[in-house]
């Protein structure tokens, strides 16, 4: 009887997880295809839809631009409880996040501002993962009007 209760709990937990995967050719159409897939999750993503769409677009674009591999790009979007997890994997060699934040574009700075946490795993491939809270963080307290970005990202005169 106890095993039935555990099985029921596992089934309920799986029902609470909404997951989609996509395999993409590493070409200029990949970011648009990734955005199209995320668009199908609009109701599940709630108020974070635009943020997730932007992060997925940035990560897939980076994968297309910076991985020299012709192997497919893999994307995962997983919605579970109060969190959204994104993963974009390619056969590239990876990168050091701290050294990549000041590069040619703003993509990783945007990811850093939206994400609750993010990082890179390398093990024969490169996976950039991002965790986003399902509910947007609201600014509170007396300093909420202040720019909270790290000093290295502030604009001159800001």
Kindly give the residue locations of the regions a language model identified.
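Conserved beta-strand-loop-beta-strand hairpin that lines the nucleotide-binding pocket
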Residues: 1-21, 64-158
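A short beta-loop-alpha structural element at the N-terminal edge
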Residues: 25-30
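Conserved short strand/loop->alpha-helix "switch" segment adjacent to the catalytic nucleotide/phosphoryl-transfer site
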Residues: 31-57
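Short, well-structured hydrophobic secondary-structure segments
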Residues: 55-65
